[in-house]
Amino acid sequence: MKIAVINSGSSSIKFKLYLMPQSIVLAHVHVEKIGETSSKITFRHTDKKEVFSNKIDTHHEGLRVINDILKEYQIIEHFSSLDAIAHRVVHGGDFFKSATLINEDVIYKIRELIPLSPLHNRANLEGILVSLKKAPSVPQIAVFDTSFHASLPKEAYLYALPYELYKEHKIRRFGFHGISHAYVLKKVAQEMQKNLHGLNMITLHLGNGSSACAIRNGKSVDTSMGFTPLEGLVMGSRSGDIDPQIVIYLQKELGYGLDEVEELLNRHSGLIGVCGEIDLREIIKRDDELSHVALDMMTRRVKKYIGAYMALLGRVDAIAFCAGIGENSSEVREKILKNLELFGIELDTKANEKNLTKISKQTSKIEVFVINTDEELEIALEAEALLRA
């Protein structure tokens, strides 16, 4: 079974073609800078990698270029020969609890959710609409970042606001990065040789966008992101948790408009807001006070969530780091786990420095892992499961 996975961004398309159930990657194409003067196309196939430029004005043209590349290398003749096309969609709201076959109703609901994730859902929908035009006869499946958190109990997803706001307007915690958290859960269960449905763990997806997740018996029971991906951890350009009254103060006392506040919290806060740099690798290299403070704020926030989730779960079998920072920064992992020995977490510093899969000591009561998350593969697995159901 050949399943294509499409992750459509505002100016990019990530395309991976899998042979399932073997989970073999047949091709990987990344189209960047759509709509700009010169677009970049990166193509990987077996051991080959090619990078070339072309002017691509729209997502429709982007998919046509991908199709042309796959045809040229005799991987597939046309998208219509695929068994399925699976799309990443960031926000599924209250509507979607699992992977879903796309129809007119699904498209309508994804469009309805754009205000809750304007940066992502609009672009995700664009990829779906273009793909449907290219291959109308191929089953197309939406896999949602919010679905893994559909198991949150009411006390976790409700905000302490008037209940009518939830009933009438669905203002609640949804959580994000669910595709990544789900994949990491499966990999840790394999590493520990345990049934994932009996596993209690904390997953830490740390990248430019970051979130923590508390998992009990293989189900998400709490997560740091909320109604939108703005809540929770200190991120590259997002504030994470702040006193909500700050938003009112910015508008009433400092004269900020609504759009300016949204821009401030999403694009000019977090690490870049504190020290002027978004790249954590550069922040670690720096020797100025604000860079040190930004790093300490970021790791301190993660540590606080670990403590809260340990108290919530009672028994914790494992902690797992993933995504760009979580997978690659031994310094960040060490700062986060420092002085947690009292809680049964013992870091093996040598294993951590080598970015090994398991980075806890043999004597550690809680095992600690570094997992290379693979959201595209998880999407393909969920799509395959839906098709075979």
UniProtKB/Swiss-Prot annotation:
It comes from the Bacteria. The active site is at 145 (proton donor/acceptor). GO terms for molecular function: acetate kinase activity; ATP binding; magnesium ion binding. Its EC number is 2.7.2.1. The record marks 177, 238 as: Transition state stabilizer. It is an enzyme of class 2 (transferase). Mg(2+) binds at residues 7, 375. Its main location: cytoplasm. Belongs to the acetokinase family. Homodimer. This is Acetate kinase.
